[in-house]
Amino acid sequence: MKSLIMKTLYILGALYASVASGQQNTVLPEYPNSYEIVRDVVEMPVGRQMGSGNAIDIDSRGNVWVFERCGGNNGACPESDVDPVLQFSPEGKLLSSFGSGMFVWPHGIVVDEDDNLWIIDAGVIEGEKGNQIFKFSQEGNLLLELGEPGVRGDGPGQFNEPSDLAIGPDGTLYILDGHINPDSNRRIVHMTAEGDFIESWGSKGYGPLQFEGPHAIAVDSSGRMYIGDRTNNRLQVLSSTGELLAIWTHWGRPSGIRIVGDTLYAVDSESRAAVGEYGYNPGWHRGIYVGHLDGTITDFIPDPSPSGATSFPEGIGVSDEGVIWGASVGDREVLKFVRR
């Protein structure tokens, strides 16, 4: 049975490779859309612009935490004195902020069950800062620091452009280490809650248990991992011990993933049909997928500007009530999606 499963997975990998080389994928079915988009949902201080961002999450009180790129995008934070970590009330009022001068390229934020904040800095200033993960209290007190500041590496305590993080049901950390740059890592790093290395899985490539542009990770209540293997236009599902369980291409090109209860949310912020264009994924459309942990999709929220630049959220957070919050890179705004 195991050999049959692996054979099937390798066939899927080969099918993906043919798609990546330019063949047409399956056309996206017409899923229902039960959500409406709400814009202008957060208030920024006078003179302070929202930066690009894919890092957003919700705490136990419904407050929205955004880790944005200091009013700009690439290179903005090292030249800025603004706070990139922003806390908003459910109504969008700015409650607090911190983090000025601490980060290179904000790329992820996760709120744990104790309402502490896990911050992912995917950029690097060689020998100085970046390539790290931090745990903060909501008051901005540093509780834990992972990785070596300003160092690229693939050792047990090192990272190279970490993209995202998820917390397992046992409190251990699953860190998605790597991004789209050719020399960055392509792996999942499993650590204790205190940051001690346990093991890692994955490598660079297009086959099963390989990643090319890993960008998002979530873990369900059973410890299964859901990895947005974005550049490979797929979502890979792994067991808590790193065994490959499934490869899904029908969830688009995942940039952000969240799980709330038994519901899986994934946002595709990049799919494009133009041959040779970044994000080439013909037959799929940008938007937010909502569905079950078995891979069944129940809803799809389409990008209202599918032919433009990256305009839809790249990262999402979901409240306990199922309200979806999104942070976008291109439009540099926070959006809300509520059920009709």
Task: Outline where the language-model segments fall.
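N-terminal secretory signal peptides that target proteins for export/translocation
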Residues: 1-4
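Bacterial N-terminal signal peptides
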Residues: 7-18
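Sequence-structural signature of mature extracellular/luminal beta-sheet repeat domains
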Residues: 23-340
